[in-house]
Swiss-Prot record:
It comes from Chaetosphaeridium globosum. This is Small ribosomal subunit protein uS8c. The keyword RNA-binding applies. Gene3D superfamilies: 3.30.1370.30, 3.30.1490.10. Coiled coil: none annotated. Its main location: plastid. Part of the 30S ribosomal subunit. GO terms for molecular function: rRNA binding; structural constituent of ribosome. It is found in: Plastid, Chloroplast. GO terms for cellular component: chloroplast; ribonucleoprotein complex; ribosome. PROSITE patterns: RIBOSOMAL_S8. Belongs to the universal ribosomal protein uS8 family. GO terms for biological process: translation.
Length: 132
């Protein structure tokens, strides 16, 4: 297991999209569960489940097919803030991805949330990734 669970999750999703794999399994942590819930709320994934095997928890993501043009699917996912270079933003400077089509996932003092929720709550935080 890698030390950067966010980068591991992003890389797994990106590789699954390139290989057209529909279901991926990731190590379950609080951060990956929170990011998975945001992806489910925003419509980028179809399903989110948790499975336990030998006292280890796994998160199972069912990715949305890109063939459905009327539904959101992940075309690009990019890690922004890295362990070696943290990127922070206040609520006024949170970037809009593709004019609001994509989302920004932030880690705030109130938990991990999307850019829309952070602007609505008027809080900033660390920019984790861009998704569109």
């Amino acid at each position: 297991m890698t030390s950067d669970v966010i980068a591991n999750m992003i890389t797994s999703i990106r590789n699954a999209n390139l290989r057209k794999i529909k279901v991926i399994e990731l190590p379950a942590t609080k951060i990956t569960k929170s990011i998975g819930k945001i992806l489910l709320q925003e419509g980028f994934i179809d399903n989110l489940r948790e499975r336990e095997e030998n006292n280890k928890n796994f998160l199972i993501l069912t990715l949305r097919s890109q063939r459905r043009k009327h539904k959101a699917s992940i075309t690009t996912i990019r890690r922004i803030s890295k362990p070696g270079l943290r990127i922070y933003s206040n609520h006024q400077e949170i970037p809009k991805v593709l004019g609001g089509i994509g989302i920004v996932i932030l880690s705030t003092s109130q938990g991990i949330m999307s850019d829309r929720q952070a602007r609505q709550n008027r809080i900033g935080g660390e920019i984790l990734c861009y998704i569109w």
